[in-house]
């Protein structure tokens, strides 16, 4: 799947939004990719997961024991990646601010885990979710995501990173907003509390 085909999937789902958005990282953007909208169509979600799975090296796919994703945003694509790879898929969640396994999910000691996210911007949620996996005895061997939104900042997740598409929409600190954003109220569309 080419980058243009991937973005066409987002456009077809009305998931490429334009406005003034406050991202979970605390930065502002004129554009937002609402992955929940692109993933609500099960056939589209399956196509995107299959394309993402195809980006992984064969040796890595063979080594993976389990797919883990952080709730909320990663749950659907994590499940679809599990399906595409023929591996079980679970998720971590943060009921009190720290990711943890719940709902009876367990990770076998030493299990090779693929972390799967919808969007990675700073990598903070990914690193926090990886800590929960390690605390439960798993070994995170790589991360995959639908969208790398890091704008070429070379985020360090500590493991190989395989995004389906890299999008470099400009982001701004609150005190660096361009005039077209400064005059409008920001909408916070994500599921995580905004970083301080």
From Swiss-Prot:
Pfam families, per the entry: Pribosyltran
Source domain of life: Bacteria
Database matches in InterPro entries: OPRT, Orotate_PRibTrfase_bac, PRibTrfase_dom, PRTase-like
Enzyme Commission no: 2.4.2.10
Transferase keyword on record: yes
Binding site for 5-phospho-alpha-D-ribose 1-diphosphate: 117-125
Residue sites binding orotate per the record: 121, 149
UniProtKB keywords: Glycosyltransferase, Magnesium, Pyrimidine biosynthesis, Transferase
SUBUNIT field: Homodimer.
Protein name: Orotate phosphoribosyltransferase
